[in-house]
Swiss-Prot record:
Binds together with bS18 to 16S ribosomal RNA. GO terms for cellular component: chloroplast; ribonucleoprotein complex; ribosome. GO terms for molecular function: small ribosomal subunit rRNA binding; structural constituent of ribosome. GO terms for biological process: translation. The lineage of its organism: Eukaryota, Rhodophyta, Florideophyceae, Rhodymeniophycidae, Gracilariales. It is found in: Plastid, Chloroplast. This is Small ribosomal subunit protein bS6c. Keywords: Chloroplast, Plastid, Ribonucleoprotein, Ribosomal protein, RNA-binding, rRNA-binding. InterPro entries: Ribosomal_bS6, Ribosomal_bS6_sf, Ribosomal_S6_plastid/chlpt, Transl_elong_EF1B/ribsomal_bS6. It comes from Gracilaria tenuistipitata var. liui. Pfam families: Ribosomal_S6. HAMAP family: Ribosomal_bS6 (MF_00360).
């Protein structure tokens, strides 16, 4: 199985409490571990004003998760975020550093 480095950033509704935020983070970390992901690093980016409203919210709580996993896990994680009522937007990118590229 080919493992790649991914970075997922998601935005939570601004009315989420810190305890609800931690519950969501632990759910996503458990999901990543369950499907073979590792090297999980979570960064709280805090509450920020959005440039445009998303689902009638003008602020959001940003959370970033970096991890190593297969592409199948990314689909599973994004589906869980899509079904969550607290996540208003998410995005996953594959980290590809220049020194990893073979010419």
């Amino acid at each position: 199985m080919n493992l790649n480095k991914y970075e997922t950033i998601y935005i939570l509704q601004p009315n989420i409490t810190e305890s609800e935020n931690l519950i969501l983070i632990n759910e996503y970390k458990a999901l990543i571990k369950k499907y073979g992901g590792n090297n999980i690093v979570v960064q709280h980016k805090g509450r920020r004003h959005l440039n445009y409203n998303i689902k009638s919210y003008y602020d959001g709580i940003y959370v970033q998760i970096n991890y190593t996993a297969s592409s199948n896990l990314v689909r599973i994680l994004e589906k869980a975020m899509r079904l969550s009522q607290h996540v208003i937007r998410y995005m996953t990118i594959k980290n590809c550093h220049m020194n990893d590229i073979k010419i």
